[in-house]
Structure formats: structure tokens, C-alpha cells
Amino acid sequence: MLYTLMEVTLNDLDKDGNPVKYYIEKAVRRAYRDASSHVLSIEEGKNDSKKNPFIKETAISKVVDEVQNISGDYECWHKHVCKDILMGEIYQDKNVDYKEEDRRFSYGIAQKFVNMTIKYLVILYTVMKAMDTDKANRNYIKFYEKNLKKYEQDFHIPIDGYILESVSKDKAEILKNVIVKEKKKVKAWSKWEENDYNSFQAELKKIKAKDEYPLDWEGKTWIEIAKSRKEKIIYKKLTHST
């Protein structure tokens, strides 16, 4: 499972023998792919952020460093990292005249990058904790328990189409701040500004049970929508074949 998700096994080490940094970087790289694969794809004639590999590597390095040095209030840390990704000079080429249709980093993409990084770090910890047989694993477990575990109730829910679909079915009223009125539909998460994200995330956390971890709620909800989508595809194929 870990190899499929992040191309790691439980005994992996980086070239410097630092398993903690190695595992964090693998999680960050997978999260970057999740956040950018569909909305930052290369296209001729576009000023796309993904065209420059330096941008990608700088962003990944930044998040790896921030995770290793996480401290203080989680909300402040999260906002700081998202803004650094978004507003840092690596994404702000002053010689480029960006247009609305150009696919570049938004706060919506930054949040998914950061939030999926955390989600993958939680997955790594959960698996390693259940299979604690290797020194490299124990080093990562110690890092997580010292630096991240205390924030588990504060972790943000990664916002994507699956979460928006779930909310639109049962709690549509909390989408009011991200509705594009002239189009009468929800703004794509990849286009969200900071205020869009903050207001929605705050409302989203009210949905879960008080003692439920945000990422537990997200995982359960995401799977429900994934199953629903798959069932619709199967039903469509069956009805069209008869």
C-alpha cells in the first residue's frame, strides 16, 4: 500500500541515512502530485506554474522543511505555509502577465498540497505503528509522536471535488460563500482564495462529531463518494449495454 501511494517501503532510507526526512519528502511529493496533477498540467501557450521544474522542487523543499520544523499554533503554521507557497517569489514572475485562464497556484491548490501532505504523514505513522519492527520506522514514529500527534484534532480536511460533492448533498448551506452567483454553481476548489477556504474549512469542521478527528471524517466521507461514483459508472455501463 505504501509503495503504491508514495513509492516507499518500511525499510527505506534516504541517501544520507535520514529516514524521517526521506519519508516526509515522499509524502510531500505525492501530495504535490495530488494537488497539481489536473489543474497545473502543461499546455502550450499557457503561463502554467508546472512548466518550470524549479518551481516544483522549490515548493517541495519548502514544505519538507516546514514539516520537519513544525511548532506553535497549528492554524498559524498552516496559514504561514500556504501563503509561503502561494505568495513566495517562486510563483510570482513579475514579467508574466497572468490571465484568469492560466493555470497557476491558488490558495485552493496550496491547501490541498499542505493538507494531503499531512494526510500521508498520518497514513505512514498508522502503518508503521502497526508494524514497528525496524529502526527506521521507530525513528519516524518518534518524530510523528513528538511533533505531529498533538495536532491531530487541528488537522485540516483536504478540500477537493469529493468533499464538495458530499457536502452539496447533505449540508449545501455551508457552500454559500463559495457559490459563483452568475453561474449558480460552486467555485472549483482549485480557484479558491484564502477567504473561501477559511470560511468553508471552519464550517466543515462543525459537521464532524466533536471527538472525531478531521482526517477520520474526511477518509470516511471520501470513500463514500468514491463508491457512489463507481456505482454510477457501473450502472451507466449496464444500462447502455442493454
Task: Provide a role label for each language-model segment.
Residues M1-R104, D134-N137, I141:
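Phosphate/adenylate-binding glycine loop and adjacent helical scaffold
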Residues M1-R30, D102-E145, K149-T242:
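C-terminal accessory module of base-excision DNA glycosylases/AP lyases that mediates lesion recognition
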